Amino acid sequence: MGVTAITVVTLMDGSGRIPAFVGEAHPDLWKVLTEWCYASLVQQRRAADEDTPRQHVVLRSSEIAPGSLALLPRATRPVVRTRSDPTAPFYITTETHELTRRPPADGSKPGEPLRISPPPRLDTEWSSVINGIQYLNSGARGTAPIHLWILGAADLCDQVLLAASRSTAAGAPGAPTGARLTRRRPGLTDADALDVIVAGIPATRAMFARVHNRSWRHAGEWTEALHAQIVTRGDVRRRRGGRGNGRERAPRCTIS
């Protein structure tokens, strides 16, 4: 049957815009989306009807660490090799696959390593999103319907959104988060219609602002703002003062 549903999991600002590259947003934001994607996948798999099983495949950018997705079988968590914009505030070095904050242009402060991500060679690699969908539609993975999750920035998601007849709806100003966009015969599946569900975290424009030509001080302020955004979406944060073990649970991340 091939791909019958696609869920695009990405970041989104208040105007419905998504980052062009993974490096335009702090890696902690991608970490939250990765964990949410895995939790949603597991929840749907448990609630699925045993008579009509559905396969789940999670495709992500090679610049995003797998996180809990590493618990899935290797064949169901492929990657597409993407390359960060050289002007993005965060970038990955090709040799070590180390994600680093880009240093200021004047060289007053060196780049700051943020985390190490497993090299893409540890995962099944697709040449592109479209080729991967064609592979799934070929029946190589059986006849069960497939739910494809796409996790990444515009350089990965646009290949699907632009292939649909109403692609402008996803990036239009004021586009609602979690909107269900029905696509009529986009050429990605033999089905008459394909549901593309766009899920994102509402964010401020500062999250995706380019800081390569700004001062390091502004970059630091945006980084702190991103961490504050993360801590309100489900991370365990340390409480200052008071009794107890000093840890409290922040509100859970909700994406509708």
From Swiss-Prot:
Q: Where is the composition biased (Basic and acidic residues)?
A: 245-256
Q: Where is the composition biased (Low complexity)?
A: 167-180
Annotated region described as Disordered, given as residue ranges? 100-120, 167-186, 236-256
Family that this chain belongs to: Belongs to the herpesviridae US2 family.
What is the official name of this protein in its record?
A: Protein US2 homolog
Organism of provenance:
Suid herpesvirus 1 (strain NIA-3)
